[in-house]
Amino acid sequence: MTAEEYAAAQAAITAGLATYVQRFASLFVGPALAVGEWLRLLQVLFPEIQRRYADAAALGRDFYDSQRALHHPELPRNERFRGELRWEWFVQNMEPARKEMSQADSPPSATSKLALAAVREVEMAARRQIIGAVKNDPAPQIVQGWARVATGRETCAWCLMLISRGAELNHKGNFAYSSAEAAGLNLDDETVIDLWNESGHDLEKFREETREDFEKWHAGCDCLVVPVFDVQNWPGRDAALRAQQLWIEASDEADDLIASGKARSKNKNTETLNALRRRLARGEITMSNYALAA
């Protein structure tokens, strides 16, 4: 399976999900939504989201297997269970969307936020599957880490920053992340429990696994996770190098603004991100140039 096939398959899994969620959510808009009614809405949505989550997890597993076999055909398959979405985790992860949905005469954005949260949950399945496989490969010496790559469809300045900063953040001087600090691992209840179970309930091991992880997969983000077995040859590396150059240029602009006193703050990271956003707003950046298939 190529990275382009992986991206297309992921898009196919989530296609139509937002419309599906909004169609049912619109039936619950109007009167103030009590907790019981909110849970009934989630019960209606859960089977379809759970089905698509399983499909996305299987896709992530297949892509990891294909990349591993491409680089190391002599090794047996990394047997790893496919991730599953549990009801209690789903309820927890949809909680941010409940506030607006619970208001009387909910604004139109309420159903959109719920739809984006549902799509994000499905997209997290493949990410979690691949990151988990990287962290627990039985032949750890063969895997360098994982990388975050853009599709170019929904990539924002924040995502572009995370993609571009890999080389300066990774001690190996490449874009493969053995931890999630730079590329962004979502630590919702499901991921935490997965990592806790995989640590064998060893508290010290669990702390080591999660100490650098931050929630950086925002709703609406369609960035993909790819495993890295060869730091000089992995899907999306060329685009990541181009993104890194973009970050360097934005960093230079931030330095100039800070030095001149024209910057809003003296925080270089913040000002670099702002510079990147301004370039996006002015139409100077074509996002597809920094995407996986660019």
Curated annotation (Swiss-Prot):
Any Pfam family: VG15
Domain of life: Viruses
Name assigned to this protein: Gene 15 protein
Organism whose genome encodes this protein: Mycobacterium phage L5 (Mycobacteriophage L5)
Gene name in the database record: 15
